[in-house]
């Protein structure tokens, strides 16, 4: 979990075995992000940047507007949650990144997304 004076980010990931194909080096993961506005004014998420690293060290960068097609406005004390997915070629990897946001006055700021693991459960004891 990462906190700023205004925003808290939590991420949970899960392996999607039914959509994965280890024989074809395809490991599918879903991740759920919860963004909480701890401030006293609304904030809006405008964009995202992800760095996805597989177990071999291969990095993929993903960036774009909003998340899952929206640029949510998050009121004070409220949260926004969404689920998305990632596909990597190894049973273990990581994701990290940041969100580009604006405050109530339109002032931009960035919130780091903590590093989290993408892992097939049988690999973690």
Swiss-Prot record:
It comes from the Bacteria. Residues 1-125 form the ApaG domain. InterPro entries: ApaG_domain, ApaG_sf, Uncharacterised_ApaG. One of its GO terms (biological process) is error-free translesion synthesis. This is Protein ApaG. It comes from Escherichia coli O1:K1 / APEC. The lineage of its organism: Bacteria, Pseudomonadati, Pseudomonadota, Gammaproteobacteria, Enterobacterales. The gene is apaG.
């Amino acid at each position: 979990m990462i906190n700023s004076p205004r925003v808290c980010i939590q991420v949970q990931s899960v392996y999607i075995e039914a959509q994965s194909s280890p024989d074809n080096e395809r490991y599918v993961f879903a991740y759920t992000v919860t963004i909480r506005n701890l401030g006293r004014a609304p904030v809006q998420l405008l964009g995202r940047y992800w760095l996805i690293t597989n177990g071999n060290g291969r990095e993929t960068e993903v960036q774009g507007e909003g998340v899952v097609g929206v640029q949510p406005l998050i009121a004070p004390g409220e949260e926004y949650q969404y689920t998305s997915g990632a596909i990597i070629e190894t049973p273990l990897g990581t994701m990290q990144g940041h969100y580009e946001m604006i405050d109530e006055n339109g002032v931009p700021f960035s919130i780091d997304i903590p590093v989290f693991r993408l892992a097939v459960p049988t690999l973690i004891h």
